[in-house]
């Protein structure tokens, strides 16, 4: 069972994907999990920047540019969740 943070991030990414791509993804929006590859949702580097911006706003975190470069290695939803979790832990 996914925790609250995971569900919130999946929901945020789901909304972004739906707004950007409509229903034109290879994964049904209701089937997004932590294993879902970002590319299967049509999220490229620009889309990832949008995701990061939305997550900054949602959680009040700041993603430094040098950190954002490291985030280019994010491959799936679970990677995004763990990266955000790490930043939230630092904020406390």
Swiss-Prot record:
Intrachain S-S bonds: none
Residues recorded as bearing O-(pantetheine 4'-phosphoryl)serine in the entry: 45
Domain Carrier: 4-88
ATP-binding recorded as keyword: no
Domain of life: Bacteria
Post-translational modification: 4'-phosphopantetheine is transferred from CoA to a specific serine of apo-NodF.
Keyword Nucleotidyltransferase in record: no
Matches recorded under Pfam families: PP-binding (PF00550)
Keywords: Nodulation, Phosphopantetheine, Phosphoprotein, Plasmid
InterPro entries: ACP-like_sf, PP-bd_ACP, Ppantetheine_attach_site
Function: Proposed to synthesize nod factor fatty acyl chain. Involved in trans-2,trans-4,trans-6,cis-11-octadecatetraenoic acid biosynthesis.
Name of this protein: Nodulation protein F
Native source organism of the sequence: Rhizobium leguminosarum bv. viciae
